[in-house]
A protein has these predicted regions:
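Extracellular/periplasmic juxtamembrane segments that couple receptor/chemosensory ectodomains to their
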Residues: 308-355
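Extracytoplasmic/periplasmic sensory segments of membrane signal-transduction proteins
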Residues: 109-218, 272
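Short, glycine-anchored, charge-dense loop/turn motifs used at functional sites
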Residues: 52, 180-194, 249-250, 285-297
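Extracytoplasmic/periplasmic ligand-binding sensor regions of membrane-associated signaling proteins
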Residues: 190-261, 321-323
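Alpha-helical coiled-coil
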Residues: 27-55, 87-97
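EAAAR-patterned alpha-helical heptad-repeat segments
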Residues: 43-88
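Solvent-exposed, extracytoplasmic
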Residues: 161-171, 257-305, 314
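Short, charge-rich amphipathic alpha-helices with coiled-coil/heptad character
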Residues: 3-26, 106-109
């Protein structure tokens, strides 16, 4: 079972002082052990001295009686010092162990909180990135070439719409393709017909199209889960869609749907690999983006195949960290959204394996 989830304010700036405290605690443990061992050696010498004195006093007979009394006192003192030494060792060991445990707990909390901050950083960057996609699709759905083609489909209007979409793609390289569809889900034109021959393709059953066909205004948008797009040669995409409306007006009559296919894999990989993990931690630390279905949709350890899952023990918290029984620390942060983009229930996750 994982240990309890913790959450709290950033404490990354305390990491150095905690590290110094751990070092001081270890130095104290070593110093105390050396001093106690020294006392025990002196006590042993006193006991040996007392024993030798008792032997010599016995040999001296009547003349050694006084010395015998002194030897007995020395032996008693040695015994008392030995007892005090043992008690001191037990008490110091217990206190140093407690201090060490508290210090390690503070270090773990600081590390966990920093990991949560990194998880937030990853999900915030992708949220801001995808927010821009929602703006793009709603804007481009009002382009006159797109509106004209959706309203009156001819070979000429489709060719011009395709050309216009191609111009947009040349400026926005994060997209694989842009598709203009009619209200029945048929692709009318796309921006890269030389690369993707999708004109006439039926996308009526695609989740993003089903959502987009139900939109009530041009101010709204639809989005599908990260998926592999057969029409785009099996590339992983994040597809955003908006309704194309008469006159490019927000509440004009619906004419069709514009879908924009964000080139997911390379963009997501750049984000997760860009999270600032300390060099000495990189070999045992993974940065993940996990969707609402707990699918791993991006990983710093390699391109995700979208068929792996990672269960997060959130404890109904938006963020936090916990330690598994094998010593692995998991930190997470739910999508906070950005501006009008509420996010899709994703999480940024940092996984740090134990030594």
């Amino acid at each position: 079972m994982p240990l309890p989830i913790s959450a709290g304010p950033s404490a990354g700036e305390n990491t150095v002082s905690i590290s110094e405290l751990i070092e001081l605690t270890n130095d104290l443990r070593t110093s105390a052990a050396e001093k106690i061992n020294g006392i025990q050696r002196v006590t042993g010498s006193l006991r040996m001295l007392a024993l030798n004195a008792m032997i010599e006093s016995a040999r001296a007979g009547t003349h050694g009686r006084g010395f015998s009394v002194v030897a007995a006192e020395v032996r008693e003192i040695a015994a008392n010092v030995g007892l005090i030494s043992e008690q001191l060792q037990k008490e110091l060991t217990a206190q140093i162990d407690s201090l060490s445990a508290h210090t390690q707990s503070m270090a773990n909390a600081a590390m966990g909180t920093r990991m949560v901050d990194l998880a937030l950083n990853a999900i915030e960057i992708i949220d801001r990135n995808l927010y821009e996609r929602t703006c793009d699709v709603r804007w481009w759905a009002t382009d006159s070439a797109v509106v004209d083609c959706a309203g009156n489909v001819t070979q000429q209007s489709a060719a011009y719409a395709s050309k216009r979409l191609g111009v947009i793609l040349n400026a926005y390289t994060v997209y694989l393709d842009l598709w203009l569809c009619d209200l029945h889900g048929k692709v009318l034109a796309n921006g890269r017909p030389d690369r993707y021959s999708v004109a006439g393709l039926d996308v009526s059953r695609e989740p993003w199209f089903v959502q987009a066909s139900r939109l009530t205004s041009g101010d709204d948008y639809a989005v599908g889960d990260i998926s592999v797009a057969p029409g785009l040669k099996g590339a992983q995409v994040a597809t955003y869609a908006a309704s194309v409306r008469a006159g490019g007006e927000s509440h004009g009559a619906p004419l069709g749907v514009l879908a924009i296919h964000f080139d997911w894999a390379p963009q997501a990989e750049t984000i997760v690999r860009g999270v600032r993990i300390e060099p000495e931690e990189k070999t045992r630390t993974a940065v993940l983006l996990v969707d609402a279905h707990r699918r791993v949709i991006a990983s710093s350890e390699g391109t995700s195949t979208l068929d792996q899952h990672f269960q997060i023990e959130t404890g109904n918290q938006s963020h936090g960290f916990y330690t598994r029984s094998d010593g692995t620390t998991v930190a997470f942060h739910a999508t906070p959204g950005y501006e009008t983009y509420r996010g899709l229930g994703w999480h940024g996750v940092i996984v740090r394996r134990s030594d």
